[in-house]
Amino acid sequence: MAITKTVRMICSNIDGNNNKFWNADLHDDGNVFVLYGRVGYAGQSEGPFTGGQSFLDKKIKEKKKKGYIEFDGIAVESSKTTVSVISDVREVAKKQIQFSSPQLEKLIERLAASNIHNITSSTKITYDVNTGLFSTPLGIVTPASIDEARNLLALIKAQKENGKDEHFGPAINRYLMLIPHDFGMTKVQHFVDSMDFMQELNTLDSLEASYTSFTTSVKENRTEKSIEEQIFNVKLDTLDNGHPDFKEIDKWFENSKKKAHGYDNVRIKNAYVVDIKDNSDMFEKSGKVLGNLTRVFHGTSEANLLSILKSGMKVSPPSTAYIAGKMFGNGVYGAVQSSKALGYTFGRWGGSTAASGWLFICNFAMGKMYNPTRSGSPPSGYDSTWARAGDCNLFHDELIVYSNHQIHITHLLECK
């Protein structure tokens, strides 16, 4: 007995305190099986119901009248269709990232596990270690739904900051349909009031980093997988603490610290040489020629490392810049003080609160630099911004580039 059609519906409604799902599977014998309940709970099963497609159409119509919508941001496995799925990010990373020692293999496993934990601990998205699938009660989240969720998050944040809580009902309803959360039996409004926008953004970034697609075809009860897409084209090597490059980096790390940041006791625990092929090639071809190469630190959370190793640093969508509160527009930010960058990885300015902090060392191709005296994006004709301490009410320099090809990642530092 095979499933010929799957329907996933959800009703998240801030006014009615609804956070419910309704799933139905139509089998080839005409029977329909239903699973329904509150997001975060196992749900109740019903069926089989007879009547086939006509019964299913009738129930869908009834549910829509009650505020349910069909969820279109998923990919659902089917015995008769070709689908995109999420492969096991841990196995893909270990297989494709080129590394030179068992220490690095353990690091890759750790970063993949952190990526998974960041998703599953803050949402109702689950991970199946056997299949490598991340799924919601409605199915598998796709990149398109992640993009939509980012835009909705920016809208919700803007409306909250403008004191227009009464207007963001449709946006929060849609967001919770795309990225289901379990907040128990408490009111949806309580979730909204305590919403951590940076945590939500980090979750979306982690989910996007974990999405690797390959085609699955099912023929006569036999699964054939196409050649797996090359996701990680990157080399990692350890940098021994006796190496001249390590000593030079460590000196810069220590001498650039500012006492005001409170990281005097943080040291470099491990250093790694990073070569992301696409990132290096793009920088050599289009970025380096801009000139004014400047070395910077870039702090990030452990959960985001896998994403950066996969694709390099990317200028985020405008909605992300707004959510993160970036002063000088939508770009990638770097610091010439290690302690400034450490604030982003140890949680002071919106990063994680993990035991280890993580800094990338990058070369920024600054090109024609804009030195602002107030917040905002640079005027047309500039390649970058260097906001200097003392200007714009800043205590420390911030460097911003606005195109991916202006960034070249060279090292990764673990700090404790």
Residue spans for each PLM region:
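Segments that shape or occlude catalytic/ligand-binding pockets
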Residues: 42, 57-65, 223, 228-230, ...
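Intrinsically disordered, low-complexity terminal and linker regions
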Residues: 1-21, 26-33, 39-47, 59-304, ...
